[in-house]
Amino acid sequence: MCIRDRPNTEYLVYAYGVDPITIERLTPISKKTLTTLAPQTIDTKFDIQIVSTEGLNIDVLVKANDYDGHFVAKIYGSVDAADTDATVLEKISESWIDNVQIYGWMGYTAEMILSQYTFQQSREIQETLEPNSKYYIYAFAVDDEALRCSDIVFIPITTNDTSIQH
């Protein structure tokens, strides 16, 4: 699979010959439907520990359990009031797929994406959150092609004017 392709997606590929001067089609159109492969999923767990909170500052430690591959761990904050856990997890997954696709268009290889945007064994996250908002601290495994290959483990948290609730 090309890093620019979306996993488990159907594509219609077509080809035909054209005259380079008149731009007229010279051959019949050939069409073929192809489906990209879905990544093989693995069953891995992540420990997400909120180490400390002070006001709107949060310190999180994410550890991979019995998994030595690459993973993504972040805090997602683009949560709408009507979003359910399922819709937020879909947004997180789609956001990663979109980013991998964009990096591919920019010439990044899977290895470059893995080395710059993923982690192994553990990751510490320190952020200052916005007041009166909902966030998801999350982690998921990625394969050698930088595609998500595990369920997303998450903890939802909210903030009020001055502090974090979890």
Model-based region annotation:
Residues P7-N8, P131-N132:
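Surface-exposed loops/turns
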Residues D19, A64-D68, D143:
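Extracellular acidic, Ser/Thr/Pro-rich low-complexity tracts
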